[in-house]
Amino acid sequence: MAKKTSLFECQHCGFTSPKWLGKCVQCNAWESFIELNQTQKEVLNALKKPLPQVQKSVSIAEIEHEEVIKFSSTQSELDIVLGGGIAKGGLYLVGGSPGVGKSTLLLKVASGLAKNQQKVLYVSGEESLSQIKMRATRLDCIEEELYLLNEINWPVIKANMESENYFACVIDSIQTLYSPEISSAPGSISQVREITFELMRLAKTRDIAIFIIGHITKEGSIAGPRVLEHMVDSVLYFEGDPSRELRILRSFKNRFGPTSEIGLFEMKEQGLVSAKEASSLFFSKEEPMEGSAITITLEGSRALILEIQALVSECSFGAPKRLANGFDTNRLNMLIALLEKKLEIPLNRHDVFINVSGGIKISEPACDLAVIASILSSFKNRKIDNKTAFLGEVSLNGRILEAPNLNARLKEMENYGFLKAILPKKPSQKTSIKCYEANVVGKIVEWM
């Protein structure tokens, strides 16, 4: 009798081994090997066999250029993030924490497309049809061309998508679907990977724009194999505190446009709506307080006015704390060391806390000057005029470097009635903002 052979596969990188391994030798993942059944082994072996006919390569100069056809998602902020709209045949992955509004946003998108007489399918494995209908009624999303399907069996969903000429499809969520051909539970890495691959083929062969909702892990990444993010055309993350109105949509991958844009939404009674006057959500118009400084950051092509808040308090014992919300803690430590060295401010005996209002995360160094100004304001208990903004990157030798795309930042200040700007060099274009030059960090003390 022939001995039964086993084959184990890593669920992260696909590495195969004839025996179970605790740690993958290729990607170093722990406890990631599962045993393949006979059908899966046959498929894997078939893929490794040489093809009977090899496709001939084509010169890139001979290939006809085809423009990517895009259409509006009916949500202006989502169109900005996607680079002008939804691409036909695009596969989009949307992740975010529970309750942030992923299903609400895509239900609004599906309803908007259906309102334009486009047939849209919304597949839900988490909610019943009556629950979706109740939510759609509350959001005013009832449309004749919006079709609902409550199903988790992938072959049934696939047959439904192939039987009708759908313009777009929403899968809510990928972790609830399962295929009987794969001997693992719904939401497992094998199930998610194989079903996503099938969705990718459907999107490309039938020109259907497909949105996939994905759960996230406790670390904040989308649950499932890393290959999932490589298979899709765009990866979008929905951020925001469910207890607050503001939501931020970020693009971390986009084959059809830039990845630096963000979309701003507000959770209202009628659901998620595109935010108007976005900058007003991130700074206070009240009387100035100690520890607050204004700056302007660029998110893609959009300039946003932000309020940096600092709290400096005397440390009673132990090592002082340095905590930052929305700002890089390592960069904060660097700026504190710079203040101690250049301005001889004894922050080594003080706790320093930084917060960026509105819950947005700063990724560019052009906000360094505002962080330093807010720390000095809190340390000296002096208020800074809330019509003054600080713009500039601070180097390790104490010099202040010019912020890129300065004219766009000053234009945003003009729109909201700001009067003064502290920066290393005056702008090349005329502006109503009164600009004061400060090329070294020591000159900031003059404004305290």
UniProtKB/Swiss-Prot annotation:
Motif RadA KNRFG motif: positions: 253-257
Biological processes per GO annotation: recombinational repair
Protein biosynthesis among keywords: no
Region (Lon-protease-like): 351-448
Zinc finger (C4-type): 10-27
List of residues binding ATP: G96, S97, P98, G99, V100, G101, K102, S103
Protein's UniProt name: DNA repair protein RadA
Keywords noted in UniProt: ATP-binding, DNA damage, DNA repair, DNA-binding, Hydrolase, Metal-binding, Nucleotide-binding, Stress response, Zinc, Zinc-finger
Entry's free-text remark on domains: Has a putative N-terminal zinc-finger, a middle region with homology to RecA with ATPase motifs including the RadA KNRFG motif, while the C-terminus is homologous to Lon protease.
Annotated function: DNA-dependent ATPase involved in processing of recombination intermediates, plays a role in repairing DNA breaks. Stimulates the branch migration of RecA-mediated strand transfer reactions, allowing the 3' invading strand to extend heteroduplex DNA faster. Binds ssDNA in the presence of ADP but not other nucleotides, has ATPase activity that is stimulated by ssDNA and various branched DNA structures, but inhibited by SSB. Does not have RecA's homology-searching function.
InterPro entries: AAA+_ATPase, DNA_repair_RadA, P-loop_NTPase, RecA_ATP-bd, Ribosomal_Su5_D2-typ_SF, Ribsml_uS5_D2-typ_fold_subgr, Rubredoxin_2
UniProt EC number: 3.6.4.-
PROSITE patterns per UniProt: RECA_2
Pfam families: AAA_25, ChlI, Zn_ribbon_LapB
Gene Ontology terms, MF aspect: ATP binding; ATP hydrolysis activity; ATP-dependent DNA damage sensor activity; damaged DNA binding; zinc ion binding
Organism: Helicobacter pylori (strain J99 / ATCC 700824)
Any GO CC annotation of this UniProt entry: cytosol
EC top class named in words: hydrolase
NCBIfam families the UniProt entry points to: sms
